[in-house]
């Protein structure tokens, strides 16, 4: 369960970073 949660957190974190990066690019454009 802990390992699964860590995986979920890692994927969630990556998604948030991608969304933030996309938002930054959008702001620059």
Curated annotation (Swiss-Prot):
GO molecular function, one term: rRNA binding
Gene3D superfamilies: 3.100.10.10
UniProt-listed InterPro entries: Ribosomal_uL15/eL18
GO cellular component assignments: ribonucleoprotein complex; ribosome
Keywords per UniProt: Ribonucleoprotein, Ribosomal protein, RNA-binding, rRNA-binding
Assembly notes: Part of the 50S ribosomal subunit.
Family designation: Belongs to the universal ribosomal protein uL15 family.
Function: Binds to the 23S rRNA.
Protein name per Swiss-Prot or TrEMBL: Large ribosomal subunit protein uL15
Species of origin: Streptomyces lividans
């Amino acid at each position: 369960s802990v390992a699964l949660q860590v995986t979920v957190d890692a994927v969630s974190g990556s998604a948030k970073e991608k969304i933030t990066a996309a938002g930054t690019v959008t702001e620059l454009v």
